Amino acid sequence: MDRLLRLGGGMPGLGQGPPTDAPAVDTAEQVYISSLALLKMLKHGRAGVPMEVMGLMLGEFVDDYTVRVIDVFAMPQSGTGVSVEAVDPVFQAKMLDMLKQTGRPEMVVGWYHSHPGFGCWLSGVDINTQQSFEALSERAVAVVVDPIQSVKGKVVIDAFRLINANMMVLGHEPRQTTSNLGHLNKPSIQALIHGLNRHYYSITINYRKNELEQKMLLNLHKKSWMEGLTLQDYSEHCKHNESVVKEMLELAKNYNKAVEEEDKMTPEQLAIKNVGKQDPKRHLEEHVDVLMTSNIVQCLAAMLDTVVFK
């Protein structure tokens, strides 16, 4: 019986074959996406909702374990799906030539597309598109981003690469993990249903920011000194003042009532009297502070406008 298994080991379907020392595909590879590329992918994906959009990623293959994505650009296409026909070679060549003139000499390292609202995985059409990219470069990466499920502080994004079908037929282990970099992401049930770890595998995504990129991100929603002198509409400002004063009146009544009740309470009751309840004193102080600040700024801005633009 052992002899029969050894004889059939080298044939597909009859055994796993003799163990060899041939190197397997290593999944210690990481994709480093720049902040600019991530923002452009999310902006492009949100602009195309509810349609799928796609584009190409520019970067470099630093070594066997590092893929760096520096920039992306959108590809023109129409329809609900992303297919191979959506890659326009003429547009791609012209775009790369123009990017080289602006100091972007990087090569195409893969492509990205959006799945608005239904998670990160590769469909049959996406797998065919990825096959065409891997025919040009074996290390091409397919990035999927979900602009609907992405929120501030958590981007729903994943990177994939196809598994060689010949390895699966021969019964070989398609890949191995030999690194402790990054962390494992639990795959979603949708991705497992659509062939994750059977037809394609996930690659760890990391974000490496330099000092200039950190400054750029910090300045995205930074307020300037001019915004403090912006005049509000007078009717809206009066309505806001009126509503805040009404709230302050209710809070003052509640605070007066709470002070009267404190005289009749024991020290044990005083310690827990505000647990799970609104503290009228603290909220009253906050309302007074906000109301005074807004009115002072409004009056100051109105005076400056009168003096400067009279």
Curated annotation (Swiss-Prot):
Residue runs in coiled coils: none
Expressing tissues: Widely expressed. Highest levels in heart and skeletal muscle.
Binding locations of Zn(2+): 113, 115, 126
Motif (JAMM motif): 113-126
InterPro entries: JAMM/MPN+_dom, JAMM_MPN+_peptidase_M67A, MPN, RPN11_C
PROSITE patterns: MPN (PS50249)
Modified residues (Phosphoserine): 150, 224
Domain MPN: start-end pairs: 31-166
EC class name: hydrolase
Known EC number: 3.4.19.-
A matching Pfam family: JAB
Family, similarity comment: Belongs to the peptidase M67A family. PSMD14 subfamily.
Function: Component of the 26S proteasome, a multiprotein complex involved in the ATP-dependent degradation of ubiquitinated proteins. This complex plays a key role in the maintenance of protein homeostasis by removing misfolded or damaged proteins, which could impair cellular functions, and by removing proteins whose functions are no longer required. Therefore, the proteasome participates in numerous cellular processes, including cell cycle progression, apoptosis, or DNA damage repair.
Identification of the protein by name: 26S proteasome non-ATPase regulatory subunit 14
Organism taxonomic ancestry: Eukaryota, Metazoa, Chordata, Craniata, Vertebrata
